[in-house]
């Protein structure tokens, strides 16, 4: 493929893949991550060098290759930011529901699926981090897979949000019943011990 077609392919990737990812990062984090600025600047810098007067075809090819690596790096950084943001969403859910019996949601089907997806997402991110130093394309696929799993997990969490209040009430009632039973058993054992003391 000649240089112009490769540059067009780079801009096509930028417009169809990177821009939507950046928009999602901005929507989730309400900021534009600094590493993305640097990578985007470097991408455009290498493309601009392709048009320097007097550059040989070999030099242009080298600059395009560097730009292609920056495109992959931008996608990696976007998926890392998105996975981190989604993980924070999961942690917030866990913090908000730490006093909730999650096993009763969706007739008991929510919690096993939740734990499975959470574990799968975390393990996939770990594998991607290990792969990143050896094979960036494979790491990119793993980060994308992790993003999809986290997205499924977030949808699952969103589906139970209305039921969490009911589960919280149930948990509170169960806890109150445990306390009342403990108090009743303490009072009963006190009465029985007084009664037995009077008998003997």
Label each residue range with its predicted role.
Residues 20-24, 49-63, 95-102:
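Short, charged/polar, low-complexity loop and linker segments
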Residues 25-34, 55-59, 129-140:
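Charged, low-complexity interaction regions
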Residues 34-38, 61-69, 137-147:
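Short, charged, amphipathic alpha-helical segments
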Residues 50, 74-82, 152-160:
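Amphipathic alpha-helical coiled-coil segments
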Residues 68-119:
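Membrane-proximal low-complexity regions enriched in glycine and acidic/polar residues
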Residues 104-177:
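Membrane-proximal, non-transmembrane alpha-helical segments
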Residues 165-200:
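Hydrophobic, helix-forming membrane-interacting segments
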